């Protein structure tokens, strides 16, 4: 039996002992947050956030901004994360908001911090278990680009106190543009089966669940970038006939050659196979309530999976003047000179990890008088063997909107500035962002919460979490004889030899840390409708095992995240208003920048620069829900925030002696808007027919670390019509981006070293970056039987 498996079963035994010692307790219970409820500040879920309306994805939950850079979207099912780490096993590859779920909501930041040790909102979902009789739900969704999505759940009883539930999810999504390498940009299938036994006259409920997923999220790399002309005033215009969002920027060829990080062997694969994710999960859940109201819930899940993330990251986009003898394969198979104006270099990243994880959570809770207390325990074990192989290649940048082609260096055998292997297409294997780690991470935590109505006017909610984190394994952060990190070089792998004679071998790592989280919230009613509210959450963390993937060790100091909010609320029969001031900061963020510099020879050199930095954000949020007349609902959310970098400094020396330096301390954090507005009106035309819209405004965002480039504010818009035909059938039509906005968002590839004073000279230049999801019409139907 593998060592990793032995570790998992040992952890399972420890978890069982801990369960017996602590008597367990209740998973975060589903509570629908009502903005009209005075106690909503202390419910575990947020309301009015439309978490599944996502302008970046057709089938995944959106990220809710909290003033910090993008991080993992936390998604829970039955109270535990659906995946321990989203690289390499992404949420969308094994979880969808489909017919297999009985509930999808959004946990508050404080609840997420106490129960998981993470910061941010979390999607909160529960599996649809068997009910009496025979029940079924069939959901169907399509769009005008040809997406076909099916979701089916069947459940019922098979004998006294025995219940079943089975679900199937199938997604065939070609995306918003055709690519030559595969007919689908998302091909995902998910199967679930649950068997439930109720016992002791219904007081207890024991459930076993099997979950299988197989997913090819091609969109991960297919929609990663596109070329555009940066005008210089925050706007962009289309490059030639390349339509953003509806034209493919991927080369026609699906092949990828790489050097295996573990063995050094040069291998060939195709991108569709490289991005495959598959997993098998086994879950046991128990829920028991004693006659005195004491409730015990426990869940344990074993996950055996292969996770994969593939990126085709745009690096430099330069004019075709570097003196390279580029050829391309024409339609007839002949090699012809490339005479296009531009050349796009890309870095292919093939990330794959083999995962065994065990998660155990148990909670004990009871409502006693005017308070509810909860005691919980997490035992989470994560074992992974992970590597990321990188390959550089060049492609054409066609102005006519045709498919790009890979470019071949006819002089590759004698070309001095790059290291080719076998042919003139692929070069500099594993030189830039290649990664490796193998080991396990274990977290065991004890937490409690207390929700207490002290008086009719005062409610207090507080909790704490104490977590022990252990990390063991190997990575490839190798030092030479002088004690300096070797870094990555061309043809890097475990067993290679660096230029200074250093042998590349796995480096052991072993860490033990204590983390904790504290939260407190208070609501005081000055009148029956008006009151004061405030909350504070403080969480400490340490690096996770994936932070040890690069060529240097991360900063292992404590990461601290304090979040405080205070304000007022007002409720009456037709209006609910909350207005809060907030502060959030985060210390010791670990990151690695791939800095680019054009040498005197005209070649673009890429160097990795690790750094550690802090962030702080001041903000003000006002949330309004109103019902001015029958059938009409209106939600308005306004947020102003000012996220800034603290201690953001790094530098790297390129081969020609040029020192690339970044000092972004005091700058606005890249890609985060300072103003966010959400407007959500809806109207019931009849009791069965609803029309609705959702507008989201994001103000100007900076597109590089130095705040030199920026994109103007943009609207994300949704609208739809929902018709409840009868108690069995519901139909819907949704329009995404009905204002038909086009343009860029996010960051600009290769722009990290550009300073503000130099940005003007790049006006009118062709660049590459991410873009807004195009106009899309979606159709849906839901049949219950």
Role assignments for model-derived ranges:
Residues 183, 196, 205-283, 308-350, ...:
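Acidic/polar loop-and-plug regions of large Gram-negative outer-membrane beta-barrel proteins
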Residues 66, 262-311, 343-388, 427-461, ...:
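Outer-membrane beta-barrel transmembrane strands
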Residues 456-457, 574-576, 580-587, 595-597, ...:
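Gram-negative outer-membrane beta-barrel transporters
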Residues 355, 372-382, 387-391, 395-418, ...:
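Structural signature of Gram-negative outer-membrane beta-barrels, strongest in the C-terminal barrel
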Residues 86, 99-105, 112-193, 199-206, ...:
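Outer-membrane beta-barrel translocator/receptor signature
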Residues 29-31, 697-702, 723-785:
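C-terminal beta-signal and adjacent terminal beta-strands/loops
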Residues 135, 161-164, 201-206, 293-296, ...:
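Repeated loop/turn-to-beta-strand initiation elements of outer-membrane beta-barrel proteins
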Residues 29-133:
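Acidic, small-polar-rich N-terminal luminal/periplasmic segments of exported/outer-membrane proteins
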């Amino acid at each position: 039996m593998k060592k990793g498996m032995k570790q998992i079963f040992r952890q399972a035994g420890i978890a069982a002992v801990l369960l017996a010692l602590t008597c367990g307790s209740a998973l975060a219970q589903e509570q629908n947050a009502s903005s009209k409820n005075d106690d909503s500040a202390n419910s575990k879920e947020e309301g009015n956030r439309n978490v599944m309306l996502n302008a970046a994805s057709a089938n995944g939950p959106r990220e809710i901004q909290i003033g910090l850079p993008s991080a993992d979207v936390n998604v829970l099912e039955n109270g535990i994360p659906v995946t321990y780490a989203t690289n390499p096993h992404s949420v969308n590859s094994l979880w969808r908001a489909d017919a297999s779920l009985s509930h999808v909501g959004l946990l508050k930041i404080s609840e997420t911090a106490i129960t998981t040790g993470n910061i941010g909102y979390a999607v909160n979902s529960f599996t649809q278990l068997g009910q009496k009789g025979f029940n079924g739900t069939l959901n169907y969704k399509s769009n005008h680009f040809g997406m076909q999505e099916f979701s089916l759940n069947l459940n019922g009883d098979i004998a006294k106190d025995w219940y079943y539930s089975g679900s199937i999810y199938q997604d065939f999504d070609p995306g918003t543009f055709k690519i030559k390498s595969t007919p689908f940009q998302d091909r995902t299938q998910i199967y679930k089966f649950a068997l439930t036994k109720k016992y002791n006259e219904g007081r207890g409920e024991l459930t076993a669940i099997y979950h299988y997923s197989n997913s090819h999220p091609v969109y991960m790399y297919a929609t990663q970038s596109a070329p555009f002309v940066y005008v210089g005033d925050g706007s962009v215009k289309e490059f030639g006939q390349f339509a953003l969002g509806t034209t493919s920027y991927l080369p026609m060829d699906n092949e990828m050659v790489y050097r295996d990080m573990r063995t050094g062997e040069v291998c060939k694969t195709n991108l569709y196979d490289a991005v495959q994710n598959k997993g098998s999960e086994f879950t046991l859940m128990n829920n028991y309530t004693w006659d005195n109201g004491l409730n015990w819930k426990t869940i344990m899940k074993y996950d055996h999976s292969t996770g994969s993330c593939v990126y085709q990251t745009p690096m430099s986009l330069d004019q075709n003047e570097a003196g390279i003898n580029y050829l391309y394969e024409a339609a007839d198979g002949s090699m012809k000179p490339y005479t296009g104006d531009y050349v796009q270099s890309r870095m292919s990243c093939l990330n794959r990890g083999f995962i065994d994880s065990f998660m155990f959570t148990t909670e004990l809770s009871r409502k006693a008088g005017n308070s509810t207390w909860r005691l919980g325990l997490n035992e989470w074990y994560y074992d992974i063997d992970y590597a990321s192989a990188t390959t550089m290649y060049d492609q054409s940048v066609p102005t006519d909107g045709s498919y790009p082609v890979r470019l071949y260096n006819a002089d590759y055998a004698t070309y001095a500035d790059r290291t080719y292997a076998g042919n003139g297409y692929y070069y500099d294997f594993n030189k830039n962002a290649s990664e490796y780690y193998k080991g396990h991470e274990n977290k065991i935590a004890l937490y409690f919460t207390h929700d207490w109505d002290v008086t009719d006017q005062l409610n207090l909610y507080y909790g704490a979490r104490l977590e022990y984190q252990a990390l063991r394994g190997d990575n490839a952060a190798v030092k030479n004889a002088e004690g300096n990190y070797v870094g990555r070089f061309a043809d890097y792998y475990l067993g290679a030899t660096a230029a200074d004679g250093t042998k590349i071998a796995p480096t052991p790592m072993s860490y033990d840390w204590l983390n904790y989280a504290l939260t407190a919230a208070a609501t005081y009613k000055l009148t029956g409708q008006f009151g004061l509210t405030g909350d504070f959450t403080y969480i400490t963390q340490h690096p996770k095992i994936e932070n040890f993937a690069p060529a240097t060790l991360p900063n292992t100091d404590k990461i601290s995240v304090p979040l405080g909010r205070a304000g007022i609320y007002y409720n009456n029969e037709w209006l609910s208003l909350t207005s809060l001031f907030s502060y959030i900061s985060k210390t010791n963020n670990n990151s690695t920048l791939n800095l680019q510099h054009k040498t005197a020879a005209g070649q673009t050199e890429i160097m990795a620069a690790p750094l550690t930095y802090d962030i702080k954000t001041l903000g003000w949020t006002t949330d309004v829900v109103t019902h001015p007349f029958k059938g009409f609902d209106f939600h308005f959310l306004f947020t102003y925030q000012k996220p800034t970098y603290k201690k953001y400094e790094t530098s790297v020396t390129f081969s020609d002696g040029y020192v690339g330096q970044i000092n972004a301390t005091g700058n606005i954090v890249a890609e985060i808007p300072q103003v966010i507005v959400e407007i959500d009106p809806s109207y019931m035309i009849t009791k069965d027919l609803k029309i609705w819209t959702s507008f989201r405004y994001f103000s100007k965002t900076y597109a590089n670390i130095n705040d030199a480039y920026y994109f103007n504010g943009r609207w994300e818009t949704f609208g739809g019509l929902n018709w409840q035909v009868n108690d069995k059938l519901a139909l819907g039509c949704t329009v995404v981006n009905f204002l038909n906005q086009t343009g860029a968002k996010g960051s600009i590839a290769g722009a990290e070293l550009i300073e503000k004073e130099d940005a003007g000279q790049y006006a009118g230049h062709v660049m590459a970056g991410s873009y807004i999801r195009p106009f899309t019409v979606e159709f849906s139907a839901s049949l219950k039987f």
